[in-house]
Swiss-Prot record:
Pathway: Cofactor biosynthesis; (R)-pantothenate biosynthesis; (R)-pantoate from 3-methyl-2-oxobutanoate: step 1/2. Belongs to the PanB family. It is found in: Cytoplasm. Homodecamer; pentamer of dimers. NCBIfam families: panB (TIGR00222), PRK00311.1 (NF001452). GO terms for molecular function: 3-methyl-2-oxobutanoate hydroxymethyltransferase activity; magnesium ion binding. InterPro entries: Pantoate_hydroxy_MeTrfase, Pyrv/PenolPyrv_kinase-like_dom, Pyrv_kinase-like_dom_sf. This is 3-methyl-2-oxobutanoate hydroxymethyltransferase. Gene3D superfamilies: Phosphoenolpyruvate-binding domains. The keyword Cytoplasm applies.
Amino acid sequence: MKALKDFMRMKHEGEKISMLTAYDYPSAKQAEAAEIDMILVGDSLGMTVLGYESTVDVTLDDMKHHARAVRRGAKDTYVVVDMPFGTIGIDASTDTAFAIELYRDTHANAIKIEGAHAAPVIKKCHDIGIPVVAHLGLTPQSYGITGYQLQATSKEAAKQLIEDAKLVEKSGAIMLVLEAIPSDLAHVITESLTIPVIGIGAGVGTNGQVLVYHDVLNYGVEHKPKFVKRYGDFSIGVESIKNFHDEVKRQAFPTEEYTYKKQIMNEVDE
């Protein structure tokens, strides 16, 4: 399993870091088999696999359930798990208690926290030994305020984001995720920090990239953001299911090939 020192080395040597967002045992097993550097158990699971309207509906128990499944599927991969909405922003002590619970109960390698406002919690977690990945730019838990759109598009907002990035690093974040910001800004932030920066919709100038398993494979997702590239097409699964349905109706399945050959009723009748 890669450790933080490996990700720091990769940043300094210019080797890009791959991160995949996955939510369950089989996707985690596939990610590990593909030698992905890191897995993120994101609260985006709310919309992607639970059918919620937004990440706001995701609970701490949801995150625990899915993170445990990912950990079982990827025992030798660095796993990061999201702190869900409602667990950050209460007060530093309560927030930290939630962080301890999630970190302890999932056996993740790190937790991820959205927003620069969480800097005090990041520091508390750092002080007690919980690695924290910070998340700036488009922060889905705040979509009601920021919207799902490109962030930091004004000079003032860009300057603020640079300051926020420096703040979370100073507070003890081990890594930073930048989402949906101009690529030149992401590059400047990446170069200004000593910690690795992972981008999603932030251009090529970051230290690595993250995409969601379901987006990569076109698996059950309806919306395709600009920054998503499809590397496979699981949408053909609908046709496969339809074929199964049709064969059942036509009594074309199961054939002898898929039927156990042992006969038992003669013995029962004796």
